[in-house]
Amino acid sequence: MRNWCLCQICTCGSDYRPYEIVKQPRHIPEEYKPKQGKIDLGTTYKRDFNPYKVQPLIKVRPVERQQVKKGKLDTVPTYKDDYRSWDIQKCELCKPEQAYHPPDVKFGNSTTFQDDYVPQEIKPRQSFKPCSVVKCSVGPFNGDTSHRRDYVPHQLEVKFARPKEIYKPTDQPFEDLTTHRNDFQGLAGETAKICRPAYTRVTQNIQFKGSTEFRDSFQPWEIPPPKVKKVAEYVPPSGSMQLNSTSHLDYVPYQASRVVAIRPVSHRRQSNFPFQGKSTTKEDFPAWEICRQGLIKQQQQIPNPSGKFEGLSTFRSHFVPHELIPTESCKPLNEALKSSVPLDDVTMYSIQFTPKKQEICPASYPSPPGYIFENTNSQGHKFFRKIIPAVKAF
């Protein structure tokens, strides 16, 4: 007989107790074992590639033509004018002059790659690509499909044409009375009062003052001139400069020969005709004479005011006061619609509502009805056995 826990019998969820969560075993992956044998590093690209001889590109860029300017160029910068050079004597080199002679014997030390590498013959892979030869059929092409063979044409029936209805306007007037207007009965109430204050026009005959609160609070003050920092006079150091460095003192000469340059010989193009330093840009755009541009100053369009400031603006001088006319209210009167018929407050919900009986949770009893207590486990769950009703014998 199956035993039922109190958590399973309860319908409200108040007697639920959590069960112990069993942790699932973790899958341990197998140890990786590398495959035996050697890897064939030959590819189809290395097998089928045919190298081509590459020729150097010919430069399309034209020869640079320098512009020769007439007149003497002042090449003395401000650094040379301000810089004071020292009287430095040239030091003689302590390194002896030696010519480098490369060895004639071949370098005999081999690398680890040359010792361990064993060249292998590349075997061509078997091609599984089908043959590209097209097999031509001898007989004529049969263009009949299963749809063409099995299709049976049927005769279409005549389509029924519905006659168009003629619109006939009604003679009765349009009723614009809605259910809301018919059933709604407004409540009588007081009209809302206007909280806006009455408009009072302020007229002043006093002359306008040009001063503001900001001008009164923040008066101009005198700004002191900036301080000029005095530069100390340059004093040259006394004595001679020691030009001996750690490299000159600790240098040990070695017997070595000079390295021969591996740079290839440059092949320059030799032309017999004289160089023409002219271009279309130089001919069309000759050099302009540099002159200082004058100061661009716009003419003053508004004349300076003359006389004392009146404090009257254009808005005040051209302003014409008008009498305020109140706006006519188009709001309808707040009158309640009265009806002699009483309000029908019956709804579909009140007609079709069926009250349900409140059920009592069986777990709220000390012993649930229809169950017999069996035992309690280590976690505190109570188990009950269901009572089977007795069957009467015939």
Swiss-Prot record:
Residues 244-256 are annotated as: Mn 3. This is Stabilizer of axonemal microtubules 2. GO terms for molecular function: microtubule binding. Belongs to the FAM154 family. It comes from the Eukaryota. Residues 312-324 are annotated as: Mn 5. Residues 278-292 are annotated as: Mn 4. The lineage of its organism: Eukaryota, Metazoa, Chordata, Craniata, Vertebrata. InterPro entries: SAXO1/2. Residues 346-360 are annotated as: Mn 6. Residues 144-158 are annotated as: Mn 2. PANTHER family: STABILIZER OF AXONEMAL MICROTUBULES 2. Signal peptide: none annotated.
